[in-house]
Amino acid sequence: MNNFIEKLKSRSPLIHNITNMVTINDVANIELACGARPIMAMAPQEMDEVTGICDGLNLNIGTPSEERFEAMRIAARMAAKKNIPIVLDLVGVGVSRFRMDFVMSLLDEVHVDVIKGNLSEVKAVIEHSRCDGGVEVTDTADESDAKALACRAALRYGCICVITGETDYVAELCDEADCYDNNESSQMSTDATGTGVHFSSTMQ
C-alpha cells in the first residue's frame, strides 16, 4: 500500500469531482492527502475544457439538480471520448425517479469504469426499483447474495462494481467466484456522514 501511495504521489493525477455538496471539502482534502490534485468544477459551460485535461472523473449524485446532472452528462461524454476513467457513486439512487432516470440514461450513453453504492443502491439500479428511507438505507443479504448482485452489475455494465457496507464486495467482468470481499470495514462508518463518498473519491 505504501508503494502504491508513493507512485500515486509521484504521478499526481488531476481528478475532476462533481460530487456531493455535503462532503465536497472532505473529498478534496482526501484526494490531496493521497497525492492527487482535485478540481471541483460544476458549471456545465466549462465541463468539456475541465474534464478534457483531467486524469479521472468522479461523479456523485448525492445532491442532485438539473444543472448538476447536465454538467455530469457533459463531463462523462468528454471522459468517454478521451478514455478518462469514470467512477459513478449511486448515492440515494432509489430515493427518487429523478435520480434513477439520470443514472439509467447515463449508463446507457457512456461506459462507466466503476459503479459504487451500498447494497440497496446497486440493487435499485439492477432491478429499477425504489428504496425508501433515505440515502443510508441498506438491505440485509448474505454473502452469496451480495456477491451475486455485484457480479450482475459488473457483467451488465462492463465495469467494476463495488458494494460497500459492513463487508465490502468488489466484482469485475467475471463470474461470481471472482468477486472479492473485504470484511475490515467499520460499523462506525455508517455513523458519520459521507464516509462512502470519501471512499469513492479514492477509486480513481
Predicted regions and their residues:
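Short, small-residue-enriched loops and turns at beta-alpha junctions
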Residues: 64-67, 92-96, 169-170, 189
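Short pre-catalytic strand/loop immediately N-terminal to key active-site residues, enriched for Gly-Thr
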Residues: 179-195
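Conserved N-terminal subdomain of the carbohydrate kinase-like
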Residues: 2-88
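General beta-strand structural signal in soluble alpha/beta enzymes
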Residues: 17, 39-41, 86-90, 114-119, ...
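Glycine/small-residue-rich loop that forms an oxyanion/phosphate-binding "nest" at active or ligand-binding sites
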Residues: 68-117
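Conserved phosphate/ATP/ADP-binding segment of small-molecule kinases
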Residues: 98-178
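Short, small-residue alpha-helix embedded
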Residues: 124, 193-204
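Short, charged, surface-exposed secondary-structure boundary motifs
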Residues: 50-51, 125, 190-193
